[in-house]
């Protein structure tokens, strides 16, 4: 903490000092300390030096050690430390200066340190360390392994230690030898390696080393050979006086003369001693040294002569050595010069021969070839001229040739003739005066031919599509049609696609109209009230019988399929013609195609919505109609693509393969209108059965399957197609009307139900019997007789608790697995409706999800309505019942039980047709069945509560007296007998027994409560005996009831002490 405070004070003082001196920013500052954490930013060199003094310096003895470095060791200061003055120089030289330490010497750094600004020097010296106590040592920082390091030199030079301690510093602890006496054992973790492990390495390394030694030896020899020359050359150039080797040396120059022959003023400036190397090959002679002459006087002649002669001898000897060294090279050059002269002479002779031969070749070959080329050029020019004359002659007959081809019906050749003539006029014969009007005439004729071909194509298509061809042929005028199409392709007039589109639509309409007319006439429909021309066919179609209508639909589908096959043949002709017209151009601009498709999307979508409607979205959720056909290969259908104007060959190639598919889609629309026209009559829809509708759907599926095999669903699958959507719409409308009619019927039946037992016909019993035998609920007749009813006896008793009459007549009802169900008429009607739904589900399995929701809704409606009418007493207001009797409750319960018996059959029927991913919808049947059983239990509880209410009231008025049996117990027994008689004949005996067992349990509880309340116990024998007599009277009456004979009744003691 103290060091941090000192550091803060130092930084503050340095900052204030810097601010007072207004020091400009220094180079390399501000900088950070490389070894302090957290990071400290230092603004000036003096501030950085002060930081090193405080945090990175230790003092040992009288020496200062720098710790600013890795592991607290400075690599640029002696380990023994330095004095204070040298330490300042070290900081400036190695740490605070922006110049690298290698460019300054200690002396220069010291001088620079003394020449610095006095105030900065004072500030640096002000932070010198005065004692070890104030020195911030490195031990105060994070403890590391290097914390144990000491400066050995500073320790040995410590003046506080005695001389004996210093002399024995090493030997006192380590001994005299400084060698460990015990060898270090071999590590067990290192594997032992034999010498053979290094054999391969020694071989490869040995070869490399020998190669290296050879190269090194050769390099050393080459350096030894050239070293002398290099040294001599440097010696020759550098140890001679520079004045003599100067290229501008001349004694005529006064300065040069004075430098050579006069004594210089300073001996160091003697020109004869100044050399490049600093050495002088000829030093001054003793005579010259002994001669003492003044500056400016002439040198001693003899001494100068001797010195110059010696220089001359040295130079002469060196030149001689050079010449001797270059002698071999010189004579080699001389010898090679004579051989070079001989080679040049031979080459000159060869060149002369070649030039002579080339001249002969030029005369014999080149001149002849030049003449041949000139003749060929004249020939080509004349040939071109002849071709132009031929073109002129042909152009003169161009119009007549075109007329002749048109008369023969050969449109492609006529167009080719016009195009060729126009091309020749624009290129080869451009500017010919006699043909100045021919181009405009040919263009006009070209336009006329285009109109003619369009008219011919329209007439040919009308003829082909309007008349049914002979057996075995698809296209009658194939040749004429191919010629016209080829001509239109050559002229790039693609408007014939629009004509073809309209003719296909009209052809589809005419085919269906003709088939329907024939079917109406053949079926003998009454036409008195209708137009004889049969322009409006909707009403006659609605008057047809179902079988006749199916035949009509089948005939229309067959004819339309054959019509689409003819369109496919026409499509093949068109594709072949396109390939003949332009066989090389097979790829168009896809960007243009996509753009044109997007332009017509909205138009086609609006048209299809107006024609078919939007009901498909409803049926799509249930997966109504089967999905098949090819996958969508484009974002637009064939109808959309054919509605776009064709402007390029690329787009034409794209839409031509869709002509048959376009015809198929048009046929789907017409068939859809036929089906919708019949469905507009409500009476026809109501009379249609699910079987009849399934037959119609089957015809549609067969037609779609045939078309799918032909590949006519490439741009639109079966479900999205117009026919698929129409069938889904018709089916959903039928399902909705079917359900609404039956829901209204069962609602009306329940609203008018008198809640009395009804007679059951043989037909209804047959429905139940067949369902129990086959496990499938169907509304079919086993016998062909009329509706014969069983003669059941009705009971006119409306038994209530207040009634005075009783009856025990048994009535017969529906027998299900040998169990008789006496029910109301609405439950029988509900069974019939469920059989209708089961039949519809089996006939229309693709709409199973829609049937599932509606049959569940019908079951819930029946259950909830019964609950409202009986338990909610709604029947009192609707049908005028005076009260809801026990018999009404029993009939309602048995009716619900009967319907509940057939819910699993409907569940199984739905399970057979629902797809696997929709099996979860079956949980609604279990939920409905549970609701029915809960309702039946509520009715049973209501019955028990009614009798329990009367018994409780009677026991409340009961008083133990001498009358045996008491009037209250007689009243209880009468109520129970009426209750029993109301249930007999409706509910089975076991159910009645179960009800009375519960009634008896309630009676026991009430009796025990009242007896205990009156304080009667066995210790009061008189009153307890009266109670026992009353209870025995109760037991006897209960046992006399037919359904309760097997009922076990406890004694009074058992009841009281239970």
From Swiss-Prot:
GO molecular function, one term: syntaxin binding
Major place of residence: Golgi
Residue intervals passing through the bilayer: none
Pfam families: Vps54, Vps54_N
Location in the cell: Golgi apparatus, trans-Golgi network
Knockout consequences: Mutants are viable but display reduced brood size and enlarged lysosomes.
InterPro entries to which the protein is assigned, alphabetical: Vps54 (IPR039745), Vps54_C (IPR012501), VPS54_N (IPR019515)
One annotated GO biological process: retrograde transport, endosome to Golgi
Keyword field: Coiled coil, Golgi apparatus, Protein transport, Transport
GO cellular component labels: cytosol; GARP complex
Coiled coil stretches, renumbered: 369-389
Gene3D superfamilies per UniProt: 1.20.1280.130, 6.10.250.860
Keyword check for Protein transport: yes
Subunit description: Component of the Golgi-associated retrograde protein (GARP) complex, also called VFT (VPS fifty-three) complex, composed of vps-51, vps-52, vps-53 and vps-54. Within the complex interacts with vps-52 and vps-53.
Record family assignment: Belongs to the VPS54 family.
Name the record gives this protein: Vacuolar protein sorting-associated protein 54
Species whose genome carries this gene: Caenorhabditis elegans
Lineage: Eukaryota, Metazoa, Ecdysozoa, Nematoda, Chromadorea
Name of the gene encoding the protein in the UniProt record: vps-54
């Amino acid at each position: 903490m103290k060091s941090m405070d000192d550091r803060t004070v130092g930084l503050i003082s340095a900052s204030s000092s810097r601010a007072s001196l207004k020091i400009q920013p220094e180079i390399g500052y501000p900088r950070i300390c490389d070894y302090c954490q957290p990071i400290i930013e230092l603004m000036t060199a003096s501030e950085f030096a002060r930081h090193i003094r405080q945090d990175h310096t230790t003092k040992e003895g009288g020496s200062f050690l720098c710790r600013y470095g890795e592991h607290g060791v400075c690599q640029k200061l002696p380990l023994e430390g330095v004095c204070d003055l040298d330490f300042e120089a070290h900081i400036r030289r190695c740490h605070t200066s922006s110049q690298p330490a290698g460019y300054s010497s200690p002396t220069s750094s010291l001088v620079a340190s003394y020449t610095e600004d006095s105030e900065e020097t004072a500030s640096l010296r002000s932070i010198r360390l005065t004692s070890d106590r104030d020195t911030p040592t490195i031990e105060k920082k994070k403890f590391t392994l290097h914390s144990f390091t000491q400066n050995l030199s500073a320790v040995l030079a410590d003046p506080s230690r005695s001389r004996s301690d210093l002399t024995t510093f090493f030997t006192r602890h380590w001994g005299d030898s400084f060698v460990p006496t015990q060898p270090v054992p071999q590590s067990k973790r290192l594997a032992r390696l034999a010498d053979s492990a290094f054999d391969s390495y020694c071989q490869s390394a040995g070869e490399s080393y020998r190669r290296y030694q050879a190269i090194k030896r050769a390099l050393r020899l080459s350096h030894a050979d050239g070293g002398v020359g290099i040294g001599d050359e440097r010696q020759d150039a550098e140890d001679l006086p520079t004045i003599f080797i100067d290229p501008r040396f001349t004694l005529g120059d006064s300065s040069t003369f004075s430098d050579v022959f006069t004594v210089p003023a300073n001996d160091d400036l003697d020109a004869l001693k100044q050399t490049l190397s600093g050495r002088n090959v000829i030093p001054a002679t003793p005579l010259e040294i002994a001669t003492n002459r003044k500056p400016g006087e002439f040198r001693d002649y003899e001494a100068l002569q001797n010195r110059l002669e010696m220089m001359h001898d040295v130079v002469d000897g060196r030149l001689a050595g050079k010449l001797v060294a270059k002698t071999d090279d010189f004579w080699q050059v001389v010898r090679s010069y004579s051989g070079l002269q001989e080679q040049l002479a031979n080459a000159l002779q060869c060149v002369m021969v070649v030039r002579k031969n080339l001249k002969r070749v030029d005369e014999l070959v080149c001149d002849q070839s030049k003449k041949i080329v000139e003749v060929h050029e004249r020939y080509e020019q004349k040939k071109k001229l002849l071709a132009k004359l031929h073109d002129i002659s042909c152009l003169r007959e161009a119009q007549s040739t075109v007329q002749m081809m048109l008369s023969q019906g050969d449109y492609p050749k006529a167009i080719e003739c016009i195009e060729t003539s126009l091309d020749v006029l624009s290129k080869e014969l451009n500017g010919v005066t006699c043909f100045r009007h021919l181009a405009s005439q040919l263009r006009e004729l070209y336009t006329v031919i285009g109109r003619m071909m369009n008219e011919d194509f329209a007439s040919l298509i009308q003829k082909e599509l309007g008349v049914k061809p002979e057996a075995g042929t698809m296209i009658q005028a194939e040749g004429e049609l191919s010629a016209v199409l080829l001509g239109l392709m050559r002229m790039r007039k693609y408007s014939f696609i629009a004509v073809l589109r309209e003719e296909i639509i009209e052809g589809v309409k005419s085919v269906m109209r003709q088939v329907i007319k024939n079917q109406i006439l053949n079926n003998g429909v009454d036409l008195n009230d209708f137009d004889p021309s049969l322009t409006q066919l909707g009403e006659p179609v609605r008057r047809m019988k179902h079988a006749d209508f199916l035949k009509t639909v089948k005939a229309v589908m067959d004819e339309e399929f054959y019509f689409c096959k003819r369109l496919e043949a026409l499509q093949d002709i068109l594709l072949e013609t396109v390939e003949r017209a332009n066989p090389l151009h097979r790829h168009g601009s896809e960007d243009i195609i996509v753009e044109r498709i997007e332009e017509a999307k909205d138009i086609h979508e609006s048209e299809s919505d107006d024609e078919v409607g939007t009901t498909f979205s409803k049926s799509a959720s249930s997966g109504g109609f089967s999905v098949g056909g090819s996958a969508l290969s484009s974002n637009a259908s064939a109808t959309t693509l054919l509605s776009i104007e064709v402007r390029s060959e690329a787009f034409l190639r794209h839409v031509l393969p869709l002509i048959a598919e376009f015809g198929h889609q048009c046929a789907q629309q017409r068939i859809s209108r036929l089906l919708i026209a019949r469905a507009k009559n409500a009476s026809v829809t109501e009379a249609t059965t699910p079987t009849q509708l399934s037959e119609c759907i089957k015809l549609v599926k067969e037609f779609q399957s045939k078309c799918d095999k032909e590949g006519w669903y490439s741009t639109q699958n079966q479900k999205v197609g117009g026919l698929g959507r129409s069938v889904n719409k018709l089916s959903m409308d039928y399902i909705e009307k079917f359900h609404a009619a039956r829901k209204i019927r069962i609602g009306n039946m329940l609203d008018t139900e008198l809640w009395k037992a009804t007679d059951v016909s043989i037909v209804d019993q047959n429905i139940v019997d067949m369902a129990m035998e086959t496990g499938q609920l169907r509304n079919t007749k086993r016998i062909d007789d009329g509706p014969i009813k069983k003669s059941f006896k009705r009971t006119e008793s409306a038994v209530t608790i207040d009634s005075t009459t009783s009856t025990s007549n048994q009535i017969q009802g529906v027998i299900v697995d040998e169990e008789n169900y006496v029910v109301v008429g609405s439950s029988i009607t509900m069974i019939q409706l469920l059989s209708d739904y089961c039949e519809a589900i089996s006939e229309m399995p693709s709409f199973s999800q829609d049937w599932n929701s509606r049959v569940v809704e019908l079951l819930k409606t029946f259950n909830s309505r019964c609950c409202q009418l009986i338990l909610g007493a709604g029947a009192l207001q609707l049908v005028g019942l005076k009260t809801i009797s026990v018999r009404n409750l029993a009939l309602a319960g048995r009716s619900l039980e009967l319907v509940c018996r057939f819910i699993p059959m409907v569940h199984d029927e739905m399970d057979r047709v629902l797809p696997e991913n929709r099996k979860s919808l079956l949980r609604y049947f279990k939920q409905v069945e549970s609701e029915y059983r809960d309702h039946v239990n509520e009715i049973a509880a209501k019955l028990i509560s009614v009798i329990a209410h009367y018994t409780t009231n009677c026991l409340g008025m009961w008083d133990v007296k001498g009358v045996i049996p008491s009037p209250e117990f007689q009243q209880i027994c009468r109520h129970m007998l009426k209750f029993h008689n109301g249930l007999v004949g409706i509910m089975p005996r076991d159910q009645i027994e179960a009800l009375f067992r519960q009634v008896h349990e309630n009676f026991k509880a009430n009796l025990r409560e009242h007896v205990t309340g009156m304080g009667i116990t066995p210790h009061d024998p008189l009153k307890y005996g009266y109670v026992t007599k009353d209870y025995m009277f109760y037991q006897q009456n209960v046992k006399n009831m037919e359904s309760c004979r097997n009922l076990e009744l406890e004694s009074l003691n058992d009841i009281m002490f239970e």
